[in-house]
């Protein structure tokens, strides 16, 4: 009877940028029982802006160390760690298949626009910045993260984290906002800090005083009289 339906292929249509269009053409044949004639059905599919996709990032660092994550837009960077806890990679890596933030609209430019620590408020990230040039610094629980709009970042862990024993771990989490200029999405950067023997926290000693008569002997016993009673160590 000539009626028809058309369902766009979402996977193929995702590659059409906003403001652009592509056409699907179908040829049909009509007959009156004696003669046949052909004509076209042309469907124009209009592109729309697709949201960017942000991937969660993780890092591992020793207590008191520095984690530097470079921008990898011009190099294939996967995010490997060396023995010192330093990383090569970045939040926005358009070349690596194992670690990347993406946008189906290939003409869009991705950038980081906001950053915040877990439970904190957003701080704006300057356009065109990198971690070492006009980057935005956010102080977390166990260190400070500095991030740029290009996705590069640097995390410096505190050198004396109270209660962090050798081999024990704590995590600092930050949430970044990824923008393609129109739409935004968010993901996390989670840094694991490992306590080390070299960064063992020093104990705290408190001066003790007492009095004794001339030619007498003073003896202290029991928990209340122990000179260690008012001394402490944050490592437990």
Residue ranges and their predicted role:
Residues 53-138, 199-236:
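Extracellular ectodomain surface segments
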């Amino acid at each position: 009877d000539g009626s028809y339906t058309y369902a766009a292929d979402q996977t193929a249509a995702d590659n059409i940028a906003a403001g652009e269009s592509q056409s699907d053409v179908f040829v049909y044949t009509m007959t009156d029982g004696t003669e046949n004639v052909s004509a076209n059905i042309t469907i124009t599919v209009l592109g729309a802006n697709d949201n960017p996709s942000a991937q969660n990032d993780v890092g591992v660092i020793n207590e008191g160390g520095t984690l530097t994550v470079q921008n990898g837009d011009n190099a294939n960077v996967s995010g490997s760690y060396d023995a010192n806890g330093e990383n090569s990679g970045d939040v926005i890596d358009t070349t690596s298949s194992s670690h990347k933030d993406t946008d189906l609209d290939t003409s869009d430019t991705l950038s980081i626009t906001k950053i915040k620590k877990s439970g904190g408020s957003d701080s704006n990230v300057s356009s065109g910045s990198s971690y070492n040039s006009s980057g935005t610094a956010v102080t977390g629980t166990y260190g400070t993260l500095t991030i740029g709009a290009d996705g590069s970042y640097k995390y410096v862990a505190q050198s004396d984290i109270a209660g962090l024993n050798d081999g024990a771990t704590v995590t600092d989490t930050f949430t970044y906002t990824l923008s393609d200029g129109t739409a935004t999405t968010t993901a996390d950067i989670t840094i694991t800090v490992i306590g080390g023997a070299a960064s063992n926290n020093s104990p705290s000693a408190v001066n003790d005083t007492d009095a004794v008569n001339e030619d007498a002997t003073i003896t202290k016993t029991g928990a209340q009289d122990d000179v260690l009673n008012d001394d402490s160590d944050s490592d437990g």
